[in-house]
Amino acid sequence: MLVLGIESSCDETGVAVYDSESGLLSHALHSQIATHRVHGGVVPELASRDHVNYLVPLVDEVLTKAQIRKNQLDGIAYTAGPGLIGALLVGSCFAKSLAYALNIPALAIHHLEAHLLAAKMETPSLDFPFIALLVSGGHCQLIEVNNIGEYRLLGDTLDDAVGEAFDKTAKLMGIPYPGGAVLANLADQCLSTPYQFPRPMTDRPGLDFSFSGLKTHALNTWNQSEKKESDRSEIAKAFQQAVVETLIIKCKRAIKESQSKRLVVAGGVGANKALRSALQKWIKDIQGEVYFPALEYCTDNGAMVAYAGCLRMMRGEIDGGLGVIVKPRWPLA
């Protein structure tokens, strides 16, 4: 079964071809960082226009790489939400139109579900159930995953998502967009820090998160410093240490409460070196299992959408009708 996957929820255009028998055949990605850098953040209108410009060439590229013709496709999966409504509409309209022209099913995929299943795409032996830590620019959640479509929300952020907190803190310290990754690199390169930041919401029960106060603490520390490059690096390290330890504490609680020792990390922040290292060390200590997608599949991509679509299609779940429905806000559980 051959499925074309289309990701256009925000500022990256991702396209891929997935085969139920051979796995991922090809994928391509266009990042819009250069487009949005001058504005200091993602501009929704520009994001939509970029998707329009790059979607067709990327589809042609992945089909050529996979040596597949359009009429060989069995289905087309597209991200239907959550995300920027204009960006979602570009991908969904294209997918629905092509599916109609080819007389094949279109599959509306939840963006977060695609992230949760990305690790399973590379490790088919990964069995349900498992606990998922979903950490990205727009989300920070702990989710119990019992099967495809069977999700229970254990904890959520009350304000900023992890990636959002990284980006905003970087901006407050004068690091240009996209600053979150730069902030993490500064933290990794810094050997030690004199600062000790709070671990938010770890002194109370529950699995919810809050990072807005940590962001404010970083800003106050920066303003009270001499604002040298060494100060920026030391504050970055203290900030990252606080975020990572907070996530670890919450993961420990989730694993203990669920009595599962299988953890999956999903989303763009899952590429963070410090987080990966800390989770691997802890999970080894409890003789558990932790799964990460490859770095290229942590951030938004078409491969995870194609894979999720293939799984859904094999279960007989396809879109009905030709109406294009996208959901900018769409809870997973």
From Swiss-Prot:
It catalyses: L-threonylcarbamoyladenylate + adenosine(37) in tRNA = N(6)-L-threonylcarbamoyladenosine(37) in tRNA + AMP + H(+). It comes from the Bacteria. Binds 1 Fe(2+) ion per subunit. It is an enzyme of class 2 (transferase). Substrate binds at residues 134-138, 167, 180, 272. Required for the formation of a threonylcarbamoyl group on adenosine at position 37 (t(6)A37) in tRNAs that read codons beginning with adenine. Is involved in the transfer of the threonylcarbamoyl moiety of threonylcarbamoyl-AMP (TC-AMP) to the N6 group of A37, together with TsaE and TsaB. TsaD likely plays a direct catalytic role in this reaction. One of its GO terms (molecular function) is N(6)-L-threonylcarbamoyladenine synthase activity. SUPFAM superfamilies: Actin-like ATPase domain. GO terms for cellular component: cytoplasm. Its EC number is 2.3.1.234. This is tRNA N6-adenosine threonylcarbamoyltransferase. The keyword Ribosomal protein does not apply. The keyword Transferase applies. It is found in: Cytoplasm.
